[in-house]
């Protein structure tokens, strides 16, 4: 972080601006909005700046710059086209330990002005530290369109009612739920949009004395296969509204970073053969937190309804009359294979894709090997590495060719993703070397992986020339390269 983002109270504080042209006018405009006492040094003034001086809003203190003008200044701005003068202002301010900004000259700035989206009292400041001002301008335009104009009115009302809400709801969780409910209330939004402030405040008072108990709820959210960019928009919104997040071992650190900072995060992870938290205990925690009136998220790797025991957890919640919702996620069979360059279906290789788990309940039904061994299909096995030897043997026993292509994708979609490929007879050996969590893919589509890999260390390397002529890819030292045409 090259700059510390801070908001400064400039009300009635002296700010020195050296320069009287149109650039100085833009800066002075912002300073006046912040309540600063602006003093200008310039040989002559821009017409609009002259008007501000005539109105007594700005003080024109001198035509030439002197070092003593900096002494009592809170901030200093140099906004001239005279490079030597700008340098003098910068050096003088630095020597007196005053924060100084030389406009459009980043090396001579001890502070910079961000781009501002103003919905006072709500303000959003964005900056690239001077690296890409055009990019920041485009971003600001998008944010201006996204952020409602009534945000300031909503914040003003919240300021006036903050003390009363704190008295009515002494617990932080209660207050948070009240404000979230109010700010998303359609009538409240409509009234503030229409500048009907008295009616909006009447609605606040009515909601404040609404004695209906706050019901807890549980949302099952699919965290996706690992890459935080694959988390759905609704999933992101839900985890940022949660009071408590119960997460498992397959949820990546990048996704956990997106959880609201003050939410309680409870690990309820389990790995095949290494249960650290029993499923029954997880179920009871969901019930417990929901009955405390909290907004609970059960955050699961992949999709909650694909080998995630989501159905089992919802049955418990249903029995306890606890409201629930489901936010689907991208399951590993879709995300990891896509990042590995393995299409699940292909007209030449597979017309069916089948997902199975290698981690069955001890008393569960056996797999239908005859069905799994059929051709023209892709078989994806979750949590299957510890059963790789049995999987390989049974599939071959039931007619699957021993040279059927297989892949094991470890840490799919993450920067440390690894893809090992081989044939069915080698599956057990490959599984022993594969880091977990891992996904097994069996089928002819695996043949395409070397040509279609695009992510991570195994990605196809495209080597360009001016002619952009290419030959087919060849394998060299177990890496895929595109050979430049002669």
UniProtKB/Swiss-Prot annotation:
Q: Kindly give the InterPro entries that the UniProt entry links to this protein.
A: 4pyrrol_Mease, 4pyrrol_Methylase_sf, 4pyrrole_Mease_sub1, 4pyrrole_Mease_sub2, CobA/CysG_C, NAD(P)-bd_dom_sf, Siro_Cobalamin_biosynth, Sirohaem_synt_dimer_dom_sf
Q: Does the keyword Protein biosynthesis apply?
A: no
**Where are the Phosphoserine modifications?**
128
Q: Which SUPFAM superfamilies match?
A: NAD(P)-binding Rossmann-fold domains, Siroheme synthase middle domains-like, Tetrapyrrole methylase
Catalysed reaction equations from the record: uroporphyrinogen III + 2 S-adenosyl-L-methionine = precorrin-2 + 2 S-adenosyl-L-homocysteine + H(+); precorrin-2 + NAD(+) = sirohydrochlorin + NADH + 2 H(+); siroheme + 2 H(+) = sirohydrochlorin + Fe(2+)
- Biological pathway: Cofactor biosynthesis; adenosylcobalamin biosynthesis; precorrin-2 from uroporphyrinogen III: step 1/1; Cofactor biosynthesis; adenosylcobalamin biosynthesis; sirohydrochlorin from precorrin-2: step 1/1; Porphyrin-containing compound metabolism; siroheme biosynthesis; precorrin-2 from uroporphyrinogen III: step 1/1; Porphyrin-containing compound metabolism; siroheme biosynthesis; siroheme from sirohydrochlorin: step 1/1
Swiss-Prot/TrEMBL GO biological process terms: cobalamin biosynthetic process; methylation; siroheme biosynthetic process
Which residues does the entry assign to the active site, renumbered to this chain?
A: 248 (proton acceptor), 270 (proton donor)
Which GO molecular function, any one, fits this protein according to its record?
precorrin-2 dehydrogenase activity
For this UniProt record, the keywords arranged alphabetically read as follows: Cobalamin biosynthesis, Lyase, Methyltransferase, Multifunctional enzyme, NAD, Oxidoreductase, Phosphoprotein, Porphyrin biosynthesis, S-adenosyl-L-methionine, Transferase
Region annotation Uroporphyrinogen-III C-methyltransferase: where it falls in the sequence: 216-486
Which Enzyme Commission number(s) are listed? 2.1.1.107, 1.3.1.76, 4.99.1.4
Where along this sequence does the record place binding of S-adenosyl-L-methionine? 225, 301-303, 306, 331-332, 383, 412
Give binding positions for NAD(+). 22-23, 43-44
Outline the segment boundaries, as ranges, of region: Precorrin-2 dehydrogenase /sirohydrochlorin ferrochelatase.
Answer: 1-204
Similarity comment text for this entry: In the N-terminal section; belongs to the precorrin-2 dehydrogenase / sirohydrochlorin ferrochelatase family. In the C-terminal section; belongs to the precorrin methyltransferase family.
What function is annotated for this protein? Then it catalyzes the NAD-dependent ring dehydrogenation of precorrin-2 to yield sirohydrochlorin. Finally, it catalyzes the ferrochelation of sirohydrochlorin to yield siroheme.
Q: Which NCBIfam families match?
A: cobA_cysG_Cterm, cysG_Nterm, PRK06136.1, PRK10637.1
* Protein name per its UniProtKB record: Siroheme synthase
Name the source organism. Actinobacillus pleuropneumoniae serotype 3 (strain JL03)
